[in-house]
Amino acid sequence: MRNVILIGFMGTGKSAVGWRLARILDRPFLDTDSEIERLAGKPVRRIFIEDGEVRFRSEEALLCRKLAVPRGLVVATGGGVVLNPENVANLRAGGVLIGLSADPEVIYQRVRRKKSRPLLRGNVRARIRELLEERAGAYDVAEFTVDTGMHSLPKTVGLIMEFLKERGYLEAGSDSESGGVPELPDISR
């Protein structure tokens, strides 16, 4: 059973949509940033400060390699995961890529008070626009994209469900029986 992989810029709702989608599909939910935090024993912000973005991206790439195998998960990725073509190939090998997008102002309103975003230093509004410009086209690898600024959470999830059904990604009897996140294999770097 293929993973449903949510990609998109920070603040587009990947975690919220992923959690709700996982509940509806009765599948385990995995947030890659949370998993990296769990494995590193510290928040993403501290990883960036203490170890650097390169270390974070390395951990992210390792996790993407583990996700190359279909496990029936709903996965919310970090916003920069698509910057590494190997990550995209691994995620695509194990699942279907669903993009979430939003207008820069919508993103700003969602993230402006969050201090945990290591890439948003200084003028947050300007930094969002700068990062979106740098990543222009990077999220186009998604098979289907929903603008979460234009739709409510339930509507966004509904649109994704329709797409998954139309494309045959939802198989009869494909619901998860474990209820938890399957153990990801320990692979060497």
Curated annotation (Swiss-Prot):
MF-aspect GO terms: ATP binding; magnesium ion binding; shikimate kinase activity
Annotated keywords: Amino-acid biosynthesis, Aromatic amino acid biosynthesis, ATP-binding, Cytoplasm, Kinase, Magnesium, Metal-binding, Nucleotide-binding, Transferase
Pathway(s) this gene product operates in, as recorded in its UniProt entry: Metabolic intermediate biosynthesis; chorismate biosynthesis; chorismate from D-erythrose 4-phosphate and phosphoenolpyruvate: step 5/7
Cofactor(s) required, per the database record: Mg(2+)
Principal location: cytoplasm
Binding site for substrate: D33, R57, G79, R135
The keyword Cell membrane belongs to this UniProt entry's keyword annotation: no
Details of cofactor binding: Binds 1 Mg(2+) ion per subunit.
Binding-site list for Mg(2+): S15
Top-level lineage group: Bacteria
One of the Pfam families matching this protein, by short name: SKI
A GO BP annotation: amino acid biosynthetic process
Gene Ontology annotations for the cellular component aspect, listed alphabetically: cytosol
Entry's EC annotation: 2.7.1.71
InterPro entries for this protein: P-loop_NTPase, Shikimate/glucono_kinase, Shikimate_kinase/TSH1
Record-stated family: Belongs to the shikimate kinase family.
Subunit structure: Monomer.
HAMAP family reported in the protein's UniProt record: Shikimate_kinase (MF_00109)
Summary of the function given for this chain in its UniProt record: Catalyzes the specific phosphorylation of the 3-hydroxyl group of shikimic acid using ATP as a cosubstrate.
Descriptive protein name: Shikimate kinase
Native source species: Desulforudis audaxviator (strain MP104C)
Taxonomic classification: Bacteria, Bacillati, Bacillota, Clostridia, Thermoanaerobacterales
